[in-house]
Amino acid sequence: MQTMTIKEAENVLKEIMNEEDDRFQLLMKDDRKGVQKLVLKWYKQKELEQKEKEKFFEMSKYENALREKGVTYIAGIDEVGRGPLAGPVVTAAVVLPEDFYIPGLNDSKKLSEAKRERFYDEIKVQAIAIGVGIVSPQVIDDINIYQATKQAMLDAVANLSCTPQHLLIDAMKLPTPIPQTSIIKGDAKSVSISAASIIAKVTRDRMMKELGGKYPEYGFEQHMGYGTKQHLEAIEVHGVLDEHRKSFAPIKDMIQK
């Protein structure tokens, strides 16, 4: 084992699943600092994987409780874009299979963009059904953001390719006969809602990036329509667009001047 290079040791550790592996026992006895650093890194990685597994199991408790009652099609529902000054509110409804597993799944806001994009692709592959609901700034202005969010959620459910038997919703109640559970901070407590959060977030971010290409002076691809200093200054200089929510302050005040 002493003749193994550090790079070879690194590759071997990638294959090792547990400490009982004979190769791991040999590497443990290798006193080179480089090898011992790799062994420590392996331990930390396994510890992280275990924590992610425990977190995922904890986030599956709502789904598991429903499945024990014979419920198969459980739709997690979440929204993105209630607060911005521009762009639509986007919701997603996601029905996951019982064997669904993506370690590290969490509220989309707590994930890096790269991780969100990767999870988005994985959810698309694994999900039984995905529905998306999009409500425009004009409708938001007409019926208010709360009602628009509810409408987008109902649209997302209607756009599913299967009929859900139960809805798990992030902090909302929907006017539908489908049984539902409203969960405060559900995107961090339910794998289905978390998956919906990621689908909605990536979908909306892509729309706002397209808007950024159409109106480069507003920087939508950077702030996603939120009321940042850059965005407010752009509105002052270039004016209010159709994509802006005219019922939202300070845009409402700008129009009334």
From Swiss-Prot:
Cofactor binding mode and count: Manganese or magnesium. Binds 1 divalent metal ion per monomer in the absence of substrate. May bind a second metal ion after substrate binding.
Main location: cytoplasm
Cofactor requirement: Mn(2+); Mg(2+)
GO CC terms: cytoplasm; ribonuclease H2 complex
Binding site for a divalent metal cation: 78-79, 170
Keywords carried by this UniProt record: Cytoplasm, Endonuclease, Hydrolase, Manganese, Metal-binding, Nuclease
Official protein name in the record: Ribonuclease HII
Organism whose genome encodes this protein: Bacillus cereus (strain ATCC 14579 / DSM 31 / CCUG 7414 / JCM 2152 / NBRC 15305 / NCIMB 9373 / NCTC 2599 / NRRL B-3711)
Taxonomy of the source species: Bacteria, Bacillati, Bacillota, Bacilli, Bacillales
